[in-house]
Amino acid sequence: MDLKRFIRDIPDFPQKGIVFRDITPLLRNQEAFKEAIDRMCELVSDRDFDLVVAPEARGFILGATMAYKLGKGFVPVRKPGKLPYKTVYEEYQLEYGTERLHIHEDAVEKGQRVLIVDDVLATGGTAEALIRLVKKLGGEVVSLAFLVELSYLEPRKRLKSYDIKTLIVY
């Protein structure tokens, strides 16, 4: 199945000059969503990890589903003010501003091996912040998995020392 045909391009969103890759048509289609999750799980089937860590919002959809299918725990990473317990955070740059990601301070135990999952790998900024959070808690990032990669933004240059798996590449 060509999953790329389920990704909708939205020009000039969230600001002029950016083409947003909308995954909601893929999520809406039962067969495409199942195929995407199955294939993403296959991409990491040879990796040994304990937890899936994923950021809100679309990362939750993919990460939690993959964690369930793979029999792993799931750790949500959220924007400020959304987690009820004590958190640690990292700031990072987006194409259109600065953002913070928070994780519960006890979400990853020292030595736990982590798979990071998100919907789109663009500049690599979010992924870098997620890696820093996992390391701050004593975890080890063994791989990162993304539904979509925007290769023209060259995110792998920033993440060159990490194992990166992507399903759809632009």
Curated annotation (Swiss-Prot):
Q: In which pathway does it act?
A: Purine metabolism; AMP biosynthesis via salvage pathway; AMP from adenine: step 1/1
Which Enzyme Commission number(s) are listed? 2.4.2.7
- What is the top-level taxon of the source organism? Bacteria
Location in the cell reads:
Cytoplasm
GO biological process assignments: adenine salvage; AMP salvage; purine ribonucleoside salvage
Native organism taxonomy? Bacteria, Thermotogati, Thermotogota, Thermotogae, Thermotogales
Reaction(s) this enzyme catalyzes, per UniProt = AMP + diphosphate = 5-phospho-alpha-D-ribose 1-diphosphate + adenine
Please give an example of a GO cellular component term from this record.
cytoplasm
Quaternary structure and partners: Homodimer.
The entry sums up its family as follows: Belongs to the purine/pyrimidine phosphoribosyltransferase family.
**What keywords does the record list, in alphabetical order?**
Cytoplasm, Glycosyltransferase, Purine salvage, Transferase
**Which species is listed as the source?**
Thermotoga petrophila (strain ATCC BAA-488 / DSM 13995 / JCM 10881 / RKU-1)
Task: Say what the protein does.
Answer: Catalyzes a salvage reaction resulting in the formation of AMP, that is energically less costly than de novo synthesis.
Q: What is this protein called?
A: Adenine phosphoribosyltransferase
Q: List the Gene3D superfamilies hit by this protein, alphabetically.
A: 3.40.50.2020
The answer, when asked if Cytoplasm is one of the entry's keywords, is: yes
Name one molecular function that GO assigns to this entry.
Answer: AMP binding
Sorted alphabetically, which Pfam families does this protein's record hold? Pribosyltran (PF00156)
